[in-house]
From Swiss-Prot:
Its job: Catalyzes the hydrolysis of glutamine to glutamate and ammonia as part of the biosynthesis of pyridoxal 5'-phosphate. The resulting ammonia molecule is channeled to the active site of PdxS.
Gene symbol of the encoding locus: pdxT
Catalytic activity: aldehydo-D-ribose 5-phosphate + D-glyceraldehyde 3-phosphate + L-glutamine = pyridoxal 5'-phosphate + L-glutamate + phosphate + 3 H2O + H(+); L-glutamine + H2O = L-glutamate + NH4(+)
InterPro entries assigned: Class_I_gatase-like, PdxT/SNO, PdxT/SNO_CS
Pathway involvement of the protein, from the record: Cofactor biosynthesis; pyridoxal 5'-phosphate biosynthesis
Record's protein name: Pyridoxal 5'-phosphate synthase subunit PdxT
A Pfam cross-reference name: SNO
Family as reported in the entry's similarity comment: Belongs to the glutaminase PdxT/SNO family.
Residues that coordinate or bind L-glutamine: 52-54, 108, 136-137
Hydrolase listed as a keyword: yes
CDD domains to which the protein is assigned, alphabetical: GATase1_PB (cd01749)
EC number(s) per entry: 4.3.3.6, 3.5.1.2
Record keywords, A-Z: Glutamine amidotransferase, Hydrolase, Lyase, Pyridoxal phosphate
Organism (species): Actinobacillus pleuropneumoniae serotype 5b (strain L20)
Entry annotation: catalytic residues: 81 (nucleophile), 172 (charge relay system), 174 (charge relay system)
Length: 191
C-alpha cells in the first residue's frame, strides 16, 4: 500500500457529500480537511469536488469567495457527480459552465431522477475487478476532447474520465467500501 500520510486532501464542503469522502481519504492514510475558505484551500495538496447540487455549489463558491481560487487551482482534483459537472467546460442545454477545467461536455441528470438511482458493477480501466458504482441523479460525459482519457463507460456513456491531474466520475465512489477510485486519485500526487 502507498504511503499518503504526508498529504492533506481537501473536500469542498459548501454543500453535498463530505463526511464520506473524508472517511475514505483517511482510510488510505492521508489527512483530510473540509474546505470552506480560501485559507483552507491553500493548505491542501489535492481537492475533492463532491456530489450535491452543482448550481447551488456554484452560488456558494461565489458567495464564499472561492470561485476564482478554484478556477486557478492547479493541483489534482477528483470531481464526483456534481463535481464532474463543475469541472466540465460545456454543459448540454446551454447552461454556462462552472469551473470549466476539463475538455468535456456533460448531460446533467442523464440517468433519471432520484428514484432512478442505482448501483452497478463497473469495469474501470486499470482495475482487475469491477467497481461497485453508485449512480444518484447522475450525469454522464457526452463529448470528450482529444486530451481526455476515458476510464469507464456504462451502457455506451462515458462515466469516468481523466485529463492531466483531473479525474471526473458520474458515480459516488465514497458511498462504497471500495477505495480504489480514491486511491487512483491519490496516486496523482506521486506523478
Amino acid at each position: 500500500m502507498n504511503d499518503y500520510t504526508k498529504y492533506t486532501i481537501g473536500v469542498l464542503s459548501l454543500q453535498g457529500a463530505v463526511s464520506e469522502h473524508i472517511a475514505q481519504i483517511e482510510t488510505l492514510g492521508a489527512k483530510a480537511i473540509a474546505v470552506k475558505s480560501l485559507s483552507e484551500l491553500q493548505q491542501v495538496d489535492a481537492l475533492v469536488l463532491p456530489g450535491g447540487e452543482s448550481t447551488a455549489m456554484r452560488r456558494l463558491m461565489h458567495s464564499s469567495g472561492l470561485f476564482q481560487a478554484l478556477k486557478s487551482f492547479d493541483k489534482p482534483i477528483l470531481g464526483t457527480c456534481a463535481g464532474l459537472i463543475l469541472l466540465a467546460n460545456k454543459l448540454e442545454g446551454g447552461e454556462p459552465p462552472h469551473l470549466a477545467k476539463m475538455n468535456i461536455q456533460v448531460q446533467r441528470n442523464a440517468f433519471g431522477r432520484q428514484v432512478d438511482s442505482f448501483q452497478t458493477d463497473l469495469m474501470i480501466k486499470g482495475f482487475a475487478d469491477s467497481f461497485p458504482a453508485v449512480f444518484i441523479r447522475a450525469p454522464y460525459i457526452s463529448r470528450i476532447g482529444s486530451e481526455v482519457e476515458v476510464l469507464a463507460e456504462w451502457q455506451g456513456n462515458v462515466v469516468f474520465a481523466k485529463q492531466g491531474n483531473l479525474l471526473a466520475c458520474a458515480f459516488h465512489p465514497e458511498l462504497t467500501s471500495d477505495t480504489r477510485v480514491v486511491e487512483l486519485f491519490l496516486q496523482q500526487l506521486k506523478e
